Amino acid sequence: MSYEERANAHPNLGDESDVEEEALVNDYREQVNFDDSMSELDRTTSLGAGSQTQDLQAQLAAAATPLEYQATLETKFASYDNYCSLFHYILNSDGPVELEVPSYYWAWDVIDEFIYQFESFCRYRNRVARSGSNEEEAQLLRENPNTWGCYSVLNVLYSLIQRSQINEQLAAIKRGEDPMAFAGEYGSRPLYKMLGYFSIIGLLRVHCLLGDFSLALKTLDDIEMNKKAMFARVMAAHFTTYYYVGFSYMMMRRYGDAIRMFSHILVYVSRTKNFQKGGNSYDAIAKKNDQMYALIAICVALHPTRLDDTIHSALREKYGEQLHRLQHGGPEALPLFEELFRSACPKFISPTPPDFDNPSVNVDPVDHHTAIFMDEVKNTLYNPTIRSYLKLYTTMDLQKLAGFLEVEPEKLRSWLLVNKQRSRQVRWVEGGLLEGEPVAANDLDYALENDLIHVSETKAGRRLVDWYLRNLARVY
């Protein structure tokens, strides 16, 4: 969305000043040099100096350390057992565990690595079941169906949230009240507060991986999507949150909201790219950055809109010819939609163990969600062509338009009805992420009266004064 359009638009989530954004950028500059290795934990002085505390520090350090890519199945099992022991101790000890954590960067690493290992194990298990080539591993996985089980992972995340009472604290902050009055014995400890907070972001990610996009957004009801939120102070968490929120919106056909989410984080990344290089998570962020540009290209093709100048230029540079083909529509665009979706979507997982005895019945979750998305794309393939004809008329006969398109009139009627329904989208205004108001998705509307199509087009006026004022403020 351009600057002049933003002046007329509804207020964006977290529309703070450039001064606040600059402070956030400076905060990330410090984070790039943060070392969350074991040495950082060793330098931390805990409230309890006993061996038990040191053992817990070692476990926490291990939990934040990525597992080797080629780790054996036994190593993955052992890692799961270690996580179970760690979280059981934190959640079920007699009273809160007395331990100071280095920073919130580290707390994010623990939750992020926990979910990543769960995700990669589920995909590996599904791959073994579908291939049926390694009977030894298949038997081992068959005998341990609850290892890295969906229920266990969700139980940990929900338990950390409940124990820390982080939702109650966040709700109190939104009401302007003291969060410590709602924190309780556990939530007042930084260890529980940070793990509970980032478990909310973890739930967003897990529910999205499972394909429950509305529940994914629902988990963030008490988190405000702005630059002051705690997740915005950790680049990887900031990026992850906006990626999964934007993707959830896209799968719910709320393309305008998806574009807004992707644009927010991509503009921020463009401002920090000069000192991202050398950071521990640079490669992962660069990959996610490319994925979000692919997703925003899909959204713009399905929901034409103006973009921020920075995003528009980068999108043209990355997907110039491909973007033109997507926006043109037609059957030849289908393979490109699928290619971009597969390259940019999350690595979906199944909530249940696969059937090792019948490999042919196991479906790749990515294939499943790709098929669902492509069904939606097929319903809108001819929208650009139909739109180009309708823009030339105020009234048009259905038979005449069918002749131009070389299709049966009744088939065209179905397309028009589908397009009419898709032209109304829910757009966020205020409140939770799931809330919103139905709005017209584009400036072209029409109505069918028997075989007569009535067309109306509205164009919003450009408010250049606001655009100039906004850019003058940046320069001076």
Swiss-Prot record:
It is found in: Cytoplasm. Signal peptide: none annotated. Keywords: Cytoplasm, Initiation factor, Protein biosynthesis. Residues 257-452 form the PCI domain. The keyword NAD does not apply. One of its GO terms (biological process) is formation of cytoplasmic translation initiation complex. One of its GO terms (cellular component) is eukaryotic translation initiation factor 3 complex. GO terms for molecular function: translation initiation factor activity. PROSITE patterns: PCI. Its main location: cytoplasm. InterPro entries: eIF3l, PCI_dom. It holds the Pfam family Paf67. Belongs to the eIF-3 subunit L family. Component of the eukaryotic translation initiation factor 3 (eIF-3) complex. Component of the eukaryotic translation initiation factor 3 (eIF-3) complex, which is involved in protein synthesis of a specialized repertoire of mRNAs and, together with other initiation factors, stimulates binding of mRNA and methionyl-tRNAi to the 40S ribosome. The eIF-3 complex specifically targets and initiates translation of a subset of mRNAs involved in cell proliferation. This is Eukaryotic translation initiation factor 3 subunit L. It comes from Aspergillus oryzae (strain ATCC 42149 / RIB 40).
